[in-house]
Amino acid sequence: MEDLYSIHPGISRVGGAASEASGVGVVVGGGGGSSSSDLTELMKAQIAGHPRYPTLLSAYIECRKVGAPPEVASLLKEIGRERRAGGGGGGAGQIGVDPELDEFMEAYCRVLVRYKEELSRPFDEAASFLSSIQTQLSNLCSGATSPPATTATHSDEMVGSSDEDQCSGETDMLDIGQEQSSRLADHELKEMLLKKYSGCLSRLRSEFLKKRKKGKLPKDARSALLEWWNTHYRWPYPTEEDKLRLAARTGLDPKQINNWFINQRKRHWKPSDGMRFALMEGVAGGSSGTTLYFDTGTIGP
């Protein structure tokens, strides 16, 4: 495999060529009485003459191009083009003559392809991230750029500005860019928190609305109760029959109606002194069968 590391004098060698050659020797075999160098040359010749050698060489070049500097990547691309134009070796042998060598070439090509994919993945992710950052910075800079001067006076002022003013302007633009970047980060944080806790917020809002609905009667029902209240203001104590009629009219249950009148009396009603005296007489004379009549209701024994 040393040919792979010697395809051009401008590409540095990578260690391990001898170990790869020995691995190939295990697969190819033969030449027990030959010297080590002769065996290596024989293996090189067998690999270079195999029909799969151009594919193997191309896969190797693609691996070396990953993460290489632009000049090295261009050089590797040119080498691959020259190899393809010149036949790139191979073709002399035939597949099936040496099944073990065929299997080795196929396996090694697959290994190089997978290796190239694994090498490319972090570089692709880094390139995508850098592209995204560049786009964001470009948007920030374009948004922070002030409009050009439109009058001759502005143009004269710009021509007469000093280097100190230019530095100050650049600093201001940098501050604006940093502020917008901070706002963008805050917005992203808010979006993340909203996505994470939106369910809890919705449940809390629903519970809060339920509590508010429980404590506030519908407008039509409240109007009907106020109408009864104003009509019977001197004695705002509805009887059970009154509560049933109000319940049918408002759609509320008697308990809600009773609670509303209790609260309404506590806040907005106070019996007169004469009514208090009448109530006391009514209570005292209840045993004698006396009944006190008021505007809309009665208090009896």
Swiss-Prot record:
SUPFAM superfamilies: Homeodomain-like. InterPro entries: ELK_dom, HD, Homeobox_CS, Homeodomain-like_sf, KN_HD, KNOX1, KNOX2, TALE_homeobox. Residues 144-153 have a biased composition (Low complexity). Residues 188-208 form the ELK domain. It is found in: Nucleus. GO terms for molecular function: DNA binding; DNA-binding transcription factor activity, RNA polymerase II-specific. Its main location: nucleus. GO terms for cellular component: nucleus. Residues 209-272 bind DNA. Keywords: DNA-binding, Homeobox, Nucleus. Residues 141-170 are annotated as: Disordered. Probable transcription factor that may be involved in shoot formation during early embryogenesis. Belongs to the TALE/KNOX homeobox family. This is Homeobox protein knotted-1-like 1. It comes from Oryza sativa subsp. japonica (Rice).
